[in-house]
Amino acid sequence: MDPPAVGEAVKRVIVALDPARRGDVDRLLDMARLVCGVGAGIKVGLPMLALGGSEALAEAARLCKGGGLRVLDLKLADIGYIMRLAAESLSRGFDAAIAHAFVGYEGGLVELKKTLDGLGARLVLVVSMSHPGSREVLDPCLDKLLAVARRVEPWGVVAPATRPEVVARVRETLPTTVILSPGVGAQGGKPGDAICLGGADYEIVGRMVAGSPDPVSALRGVAEYIAARCPEKLLHSSTGNGPS
């Protein structure tokens, strides 16, 4: 049995399953079945759609049903009508879908939010990204993007594990909104940076787990690292925001 802090930490790790080639699709779908019963859930997006089609997205959602959060990451960024069509076609079976906050409210995110509400899914808005280029455009506009998020009232927002100071700023502005933080591992963020230093609810880990020959052990290793950094914080806080 995991120590209490590790048991809490593993429930804060979402595994990103992004195939690099067509041959990876089946392997990552098999992995979905394994990690969904251990971690917080999975995130799939454009690589899975491009290489496996909408059927692969639906299969990932099916395999993880009842095993954690199922996050669809298409980073939607269009007028409301187009985002609504995409959500109606691809979001069924997922607990949450990601879109860009910069689209704005009127004629955009308000329509997507209404569509997702009708599908029983939650909206997650990107307010900052994990790559260095986010500093060029998104981060200078962070206050405006957070204002959009306050107006839209999404379930969650995306903020980068690679810059925990941004996560902390988002947490200060949106104290009750779920924060999902990508960029752990290959992009340079250390496990626990976003949760322990920034106040994120979830960290998203991709290649560090998905590229391992033993993904469950790799996932537990990430959780152990997080737990060692801030056990008290983990034990005295709970996301309470899993799928209903």
Curated annotation (Swiss-Prot):
Known EC number: 4.1.1.23
Listed pathway(s): Pyrimidine metabolism; UMP biosynthesis via de novo pathway; UMP from orotate: step 2/2
UniProt keyword terms in alphabetical order: Decarboxylase, Lyase, Pyrimidine biosynthesis
Catalytic residues as annotated in Swiss-Prot or TrEMBL: K75 (proton donor)
Family: Belongs to the OMP decarboxylase family. Type 1 subfamily.
Role description: Catalyzes the decarboxylation of orotidine 5'-monophosphate (OMP) to uridine 5'-monophosphate (UMP).
Protein name: Orotidine 5'-phosphate decarboxylase
Origin species: Aeropyrum pernix (strain ATCC 700893 / DSM 11879 / JCM 9820 / NBRC 100138 / K1)
